[in-house]
């Protein structure tokens, strides 16, 4: 990875982590104040990768966010021989470097959607950006879905009018449970292997994707912060969370990439919900 590219992308992911954690802690504070509770805070844990690099896992378990994790990492080394053929540009020597941020939020309220987001920059003998964000409501609402998609469409349209329809389609295709023949949530955008030939433009786009998430998801959470919910709704949420687990363990590229590169297991599996039911 080019040193300057590595530094500026890694610094951005760290900055975005701080912005997201600050906003989520603020939401916890807003809720706690009305209930005379002590607001939850993120707990950070650093980890080192044996083959090179490491990361920081930020985890919060609160009254609003039952479990929310924000991970940043910068790792480098060599892919195992059996994994090299799956990664563009790694076929010859297997060398790679990757930096990125990943976020998964599971809310206590079954009325507030779960959310997944990540962006990353990877170099082998080639280089590219990837990432996106998607929403998983248990009780979908059309206006909420439209608002989420509109935020990402605005970010996409600044760069290419073809980005949003392309990345939306890729998201719908990627977050699909083939064995159940059903989607995981209401989508968003998903892009990978993005290299337009203009690093600055691709990096700027990836930054705007992060800011789009920061602008829209906290608004969705706040809109339902104090809505009452029933035991039946909670039960349904726990059952539907099972689909989330199935996808992440069977299909998720990030999970596979992390495990195949000897990443931190706790950080990799942070995406799993804290409580789930299988019927």
UniProtKB/Swiss-Prot annotation:
MF terms (GO), sorted A to Z = coproporphyrinogen oxidase activity; metal ion binding; protein homodimerization activity
Q: Which domain of life is it from?
A: Bacteria
GO CC annotation, single: cytoplasm
EC class name = oxidoreductase
Site features described as Important for dimerization, chain residue numbers: 179
Enzyme Commission no = 1.3.3.3
The active site annotation covers 116 (proton donor)
| Keyword terms | Cytoplasm, Heme biosynthesis, Metal-binding, Oxidoreductase, Porphyrin biosynthesis
Subcellular location as annotated: Cytoplasm
Pfam families from the entry? Coprogen_oxidas
Which residue intervals make up region (Important for dimerization)? 244-279
Q: What SUPFAM superfamilies does its record include?
A: Coproporphyrinogen III oxidase
* Record keyword Chloroplast present: no
Q: Does the keyword Oxidoreductase apply?
A: yes
Co-factor requirement: a divalent metal cation
Task: List positions binding substrate.
Answer: 102, 118-120
Family per record: Belongs to the aerobic coproporphyrinogen-III oxidase family.
| Subunit text | Homodimer.
NCBIfam families from the UniProt entry:
PRK05330.1
Its biological purpose: Involved in the heme biosynthesis. Catalyzes the aerobic oxidative decarboxylation of propionate groups of rings A and B of coproporphyrinogen-III to yield the vinyl groups in protoporphyrinogen-IX.
Name of the protein in its database record: Oxygen-dependent coproporphyrinogen-III oxidase
């Amino acid at each position: 990875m080019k040193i300057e590219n590595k530094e500026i992308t890694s610094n951005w992911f760290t900055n975005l982590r701080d912005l997201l954690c600050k906003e989520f802690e603020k939401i916890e504070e807003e809720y706690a104040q009305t209930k005379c509770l002590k607001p939850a805070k993120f707990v950070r844990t650093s980890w080192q990768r044996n083959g090179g690099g490491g990361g920081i896992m930020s985890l919060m378990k609160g009254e609003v966010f039952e479990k929310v994790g924000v991970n940043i990492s910068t790792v480098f080394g060599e892919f195992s021989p059996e994994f090299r053929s799956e990664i563009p540009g790694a076929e010859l020597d297997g060398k790679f470097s990757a930096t990125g941020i990943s976020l998964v939020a599971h809310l206590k309220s079954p009325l507030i959607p779960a959310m997944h987001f990540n962006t990353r920059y990877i170099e082998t003998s080639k280089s590219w950006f990837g990432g996106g964000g998607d929403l998983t409501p248990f009780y979908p609402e059309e206006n909420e879905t439209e608002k989420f998609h509109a935020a990402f469409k605005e970010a996409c349209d600044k760069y290419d009018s073809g980005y949003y329809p392309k990345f939306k389609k890729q998201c719908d295709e990627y977050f699909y449970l083939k064995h159940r023949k059903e989607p995981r949530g209401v989508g968003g955008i998903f892009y990978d292997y993005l290299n337009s030939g203009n690093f600055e433009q691709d990096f700027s786009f990836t930054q705007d994707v992060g800011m789009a998430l920061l602008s829209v998801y906290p608004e969705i959470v706040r809109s339902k912060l104090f809505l009452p919910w029933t035991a039946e709704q909670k039960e349904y949420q726990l059952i539907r969370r099972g689909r989330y687990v199935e996808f992440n363990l069977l299909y998720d590229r990030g999970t596979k990439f992390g495990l195949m590169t000897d990443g931190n297991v706790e950080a990799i599996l942070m995406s799993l919900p804290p409580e789930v039911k299988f019927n």
